[in-house]
Amino acid sequence: MSDTTDLIRQKLAALEPAKIDIIDDSARHAGHAGARGGGGHYSVIIVSSQFSGKTALARHRLVYDTLRELMHKHIHALSVKAYTPEESDLIH
């Protein structure tokens, strides 16, 4: 697990996730302009009751706001899938 992955996990703990998966996709983007600047590419799948009653856009904003201080320096690109526990049960 990378240091940035650990930082993402620590920050997202504020959302009290029931489940969180963080995938470092940076190696797939080697040579990409963002990779040269040090920011990595990450995918996050997060399940939290804090997403209940929120639109997909509001959920993404909540995740991005939580990770704001990591954006650009540590994170160049971020893919987010945010679910409530009930939605997660239906998917998995």
For the regions a language model picked out, list residue spans one by one.
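Ordered, soluble secondary-structure elements with a strong preference for glycine-centered loop motifs
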Residues: 2, 53-57
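Conserved interaction-surface patches within small, structured recognition/assembly domains
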Residues: 43-53, 76, 81
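N-terminal first-folded block
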Residues: 2-34
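Residues within mature, well-folded domains
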Residues: 28, 49, 85-88
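A generic structural signal for short beta-strands and their flanking turns/coil linkers
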Residues: 16-18, 38-42, 74-78
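C-terminal structural segments of small proteins and small subunits
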Residues: 57, 61-92
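Hydrophobic aliphatic residue packing
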Residues: 8, 22, 44-47, 63
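A short, structured beta-strand/loop element
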Residues: 31-48
